């Protein structure tokens, strides 16, 4: 039985860990995840999805604020594990830890060398890519730069968003890892170096990137909305106040960018640089998220055709 230290944090990682736990070839000797954090307006302390799963399986859990040079790292090395599997852990792994293992692989949610970094799924959708995927890669000191063990793609559909793609890619990553890992450990797979000329990056989304520019095409704005749902959520301004847009549809229509070109009791259509967006789910500043019909029957009832978003 191969002894593995698993490292991961979000639901994506928990799906991968779940796969390893169902495979009798692997013994998870430790789980490393990010510390519990305060989240939401109420600042409630919340554990990571990986920690929740580890607790349910009574696995040893480590949550160092910083792994490098920590007491926890020394303890992990002393476990005598065969290897490390990571999936969206959120910290760099020290060379000392990597060097102490027979193998260390990462499940990364992109088709490397494209989209190294922390937000590959967001950027794949925002950039209008036809497909996304997962790569099993060897861990090295440089971020997501290791040789590729295996890779698999799937299409991005218009109805997809970050949430749906996270779920799909988590399952794809889990299955690809279980399919690949035995042959890799046995030395039957020769990892392939990444093409340095094709490397792109996907850093965490900045606040500026969340803001919609209505001068862009409808397709670009549609992709941006989907590429930020359910987090961090795209936003614009309405009467000088922040206005979040969770969901919208790409529709035909012409008008001055950012201007309302159609309003009914159940729909609100905003012109873009090319085409238009029909808003579906929104959140005015200081209000809860709501369907567009509820918005138009409430705080948005006085909006008229010609009113402007983005200012």
UniProtKB/Swiss-Prot annotation:
EC numbers: 2.1.2.9
Pfam families linked to this entry: Formyl_trans_C (PF02911), Formyl_trans_N (PF00551)
InterPro entries named in the record: Fmt, Formyl_trans_C, Formyl_trans_C_sf, Formyl_transf_N, Formyl_transf_N_sf, Formyl_transferase-like_C_sf, GART_AS, Met-tRNA-FMT_C
Residues noted as binding (6S)-5,6,7,8-tetrahydrofolate in the record, renumbered to the chain: 110-113
Catalysed reactions listed for this entry: L-methionyl-tRNA(fMet) + (6R)-10-formyltetrahydrofolate = N-formyl-L-methionyl-tRNA(fMet) + (6S)-5,6,7,8-tetrahydrofolate + H(+)
SUPFAM superfamilies: FMT C-terminal domain-like (SSF50486), Formyltransferase (SSF53328)
Gene Ontology molecular function, alphabetical: methionyl-tRNA formyltransferase activity
Annotated GO CC locations: cytosol
Key words of the record: Protein biosynthesis, Transferase
Record family assignment: Belongs to the Fmt family.
Function: Attaches a formyl group to the free amino group of methionyl-tRNA(fMet). The formyl group appears to play a dual role in the initiator identity of N-formylmethionyl-tRNA by promoting its recognition by IF2 and preventing the misappropriation of this tRNA by the elongation apparatus.
The protein, known as: Methionyl-tRNA formyltransferase
Origin organism lineage: Bacteria, Bacillati, Bacillota, Bacilli, Lactobacillales
